[in-house]
Amino acid sequence: EYILTVAKSGMTEQQLKAKLESKLLELGAEGTSFSTIVASGHRGALPHGVASDKIIEQGDMITLDFGAYYQGYASDITRTFAIGEPNPKLKEIYNIVLAANQKAIEAAKAGISSKALDAVARDYITKQGYGEAFGHSLGHGIGLDVHEGPVLAKNTDSALQVNNCVTIEP
């Protein structure tokens, strides 16, 4: 919620990154768990787009991918939001990705294979006409490190187990 109050058109991605990381430290984070991603406008579709000097504009969708260490554990959070009213096509794509994310979260149960869980999100996005844009794995385990097993991907057979903590990232 904090970031929605400070993200404004006219600031750079780097400036927004600095505000986000400063807030994490203020709240008790021991440091970031990986390099913070802030990608706006046309850069928002980059799966690992590091923050740049690009100026955030009205109507831009902004993707934040960030995490912190707290009491020895890592977090990994991705959020996407708009500055003002986004282009209707971008809003449609956002809603498709959100629905795929929610479907995968609902399907994430002990015993499901990583491959089958990945297919829940990937198949939905493909049916909506955007399968070629899904170039990333579905997610990964998280805990003492930001990237742990299991890997949730279309070519991974391992199954989720009780108490796995995983990210769902489409």
Language-model features, listed with the residues they occupy:
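Active-site neighborhoods and metal-handling regions in enzymes and metal-associated proteins
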Residues: 1-170
